[in-house]
């Protein structure tokens, strides 16, 4: 997991790499787009904006082929992050959606969520899973970018 407090800090750290430069462009564009409509830049990423409630899940979610990048637009976003190896599988991985779901082992405590500030950026690694701490009716918008794990 990598957390940047602002898009400017993200740009300073990663904009020298083409796919991350495009990720920054996608985040900037997604703040002006209609909700729930996916777009792409090149062949390495897709992006869209959704209400935070659409990301809420009672399970941890992890991916194998894409980094998930989250950037809250209107309200801070609380995200629980754990290594997949510290979780128990809660169903089969779907190659179609590139999604695996996980649960806490032995009813462990959730711990403290990572809070992504408005305009901040959270990058999830393929070895991690996340659970968004939001209710299904949360309306704050979040930019979601899926970036291929190939290359860096």
Roles of regions detected by a PLM:
Residues 64-79, 83-86, 92-105, 147-148:
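Short, conserved beta-strand element in jelly-roll/cupin
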